């Protein structure tokens, strides 16, 4: 059983992360951003490869990608303002 949303969120985080060079990005901060996003997105569990492919296609639409990016950017900004790792808080633009 796999939560396809988790895989997609991780991929999108890796794609967006370089756009925010001031963000700490340590394991703790990355985990906090992923958890923030996953708690605001609907999970999509699958048990077959076919289900995974179909769900990836659904989550790959422009509308879903935009929604995911908005949630991830919100998470990046919130975590950057109060990093639990001890890094200096920063405001991301």
Residue ranges and their predicted role:
Residues 1-93:
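Intrinsically disordered, low-complexity, basic-enriched segments
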